[in-house]
Amino acid sequence: MKQYKTVNNLVGWITFLIAATVYCMTIEPTASFWDCPEFITTGYKLEVGHPPGAPFFMLVANLFSQFASDASTVAKMVNYMSALMSGACILFLFWSITHLVRKLVVTDENNITRGQMVTIMGSGLVGALAYTFSDTFWFSAVEGEVYAFSSLFTAVVFWLILKWEDVANEPHSDRWLILIAYLTGLSIGVHLLNLLCLPAIVLVYYYKKVPNANAKGSLLALLASGILVAAVLYGIVPGIVKVGGWFELFFVNTLGMSFNTGVIIYIILLAACLIWGIYESYTERNKARMVLSFILTIAMLGIPFYGHGTSSVVIGVIVIAALWLYLRPKTQAAVKEKFRVSARTLNTSLLCTMMIVIGYSSYALIVIRSTANTPMDQNSPEDIFTLGEYLGREQYGTRPLFYGPAFSSQVALDVKDGYCEPRIKYNGTKFIRKEKATPNEKDSYIEIPGRIEYEYAQNMLFPRMYSSAHTQQYHAWQDIKGYDVPYDKCGNMIMVNMPTQWENIKFFFSYQLNWMYWRYFMWNFAGRQNDIQGSGEIEHGNWITGIPFIDNWLVGDQSLLPQELKDNKGHNVFYCLPLLLGIIGLLWQAYRGQKGIQQFWVVFFLFFMTGIAIVLYLNQTPSQPRERDYAYAGSFYAFAIWIGMGVAGLVRLLQDYAKMKELPAAAIVSVACLFVPVQMASQTWDDHDRSDRYMARDFGQNYLMSLQESGNPIIYTNGDNDTFPVSYTHLTLPTNREV
């Protein structure tokens, strides 16, 4: 086992060096398009970017920017940060694959044969390198964006739960869980995508704690993981701001104290409750106090108070009462032992919660820097209330998920005083600082209506075609005949044509699942037609294989395309080899007995939650401003695990059907399968090598240099690709233009 650990560490670091070297060689030397210039600027100058911000990314980017020789190399340093983090992501992917394969291949941990060693290392190397050279991950690895950092968090926390699995029965194994919680809290300050790893993590925990796990228990574990995700995403993240806001209102508006007094007192009390709860659950001196301190901490974090206004308070009181009734000593003594909540469980839960809060506290940076009125100060989140709006991304609006209007739905109307009025609802209220009439006037907040939303007369389940601004695009993607619904327009009865539920589902499969997910998936593991953004046309942005008869069936004869499309650098063909390896790997894993099927469900839910679950949540409309494959990198990461396992699956096939010994079979398969990532690298290098791209920087400079040098000229920009390069050039690079 010692020899295995040495080899595993050595090959893992070699994989890291390969990936990091490739990414550092191909980084963009300056800012890229889209959000990159903004993130680089906010990192370098610690300014406030678009909601919901990325404060921990800003802090680490600022650290890397200190290595810049001058302002012109700041972007390069931040891009190096992404490259190194992406290389580290590959390292942890390698170790995750070797861990999972070892569990299925090795029967005696103290006597790992050479054949088993080669199988495990070959699996890790092929899977990790396939992901290294995949289209989506390489794209994010060479630019200053949050997705490389987020991918590293995903890789690390998944690897950590596998490390915990090895030591789960040791006395201090909970420290791995606490470290996962801390990294989860930190990841909130980068991107919320990392929370989607929690179901896979919970399954690993369940399968280790319950060796004879069954389907019912697995479903309950998944339900618990969903509650855990909701507790962080809809509990802690907005809850701390909500309860802190209540304290702020009480101390400022009621007691007449100055701004931020309530927030400071809330932070002190929250810290005190956490420490008290941890102390009581550690000492176990008084069970009633232990439960009380735990529930008080949960309440102070705002986890039970879901929603807005009075309803959130009612929900919170009900949840708190239910927790007390279940956790109180009398109830715990009456229930069966397997349903009891131990002091260790409460203590670990509170420690994990505290670490999440510590990680999440990076958002204090946003308020501090906004108060300093930095040049870029989007939404100006200077107090607890504006921070809540900033975190909630309220400027982006909402979209229906389970029930809501279709694109043709009409606003519900009510007759009032002889006039027709649209039916509207207010989502809570907002509080803003009152402008003082005199310097001696006390600080106070005033209440204003919250976000206003229209109510619609016609609604449907699972609305996928909901945007009235995209009516033509829906019809272009789907042959919509619909059905007529009567609509009373203030006494004038008209018919509204609504899409059928089946047409709605067909759009979900044809556009949202196929075009906006499956197409990206196949880019990475089958091949890509070109890098021109597609909107459904046959010659732009489709996935291909490089196998003529398949491609002819999919998108027509590619030899008939214009030469400029044939020569497009984004034309990459993998002949479906990574896809086939992944399918072999997932089948091999699923059929390796109970341990194999348990592993399969762990990897599957990592794959599902970071892929299809995001598709369901985003509910995207046609004509997106850019390709969205970067959002699903975690799903492709999970599939890379199966690609690595494909090596072990092929070794098994040679052993079973060619009657080969394990060592030669493992050596042959590992060497042969290494040609898959080599083929991927040969195809994707030219379109991912950004080492000589300066277009975004030049674009921003051209905008600024076209302005007059004095007189404070005003410039109007259109969208991300106009605004952010200009902001980067103006705020990061030295210019002589005061805009």
Q: What do these predicted ranges mean?
A:
Residues 5-33, 131-133, 185, 191, ...:
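Transmembrane signal-anchor helices characteristic of membrane glycosylation enzymes that use polyprenol
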Residues 24-25, 71-79, 104-117, 124-151, ...:
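Aromatic- and kink-enriched transmembrane "portal" helix at the membrane-lumen/periplasm boundary
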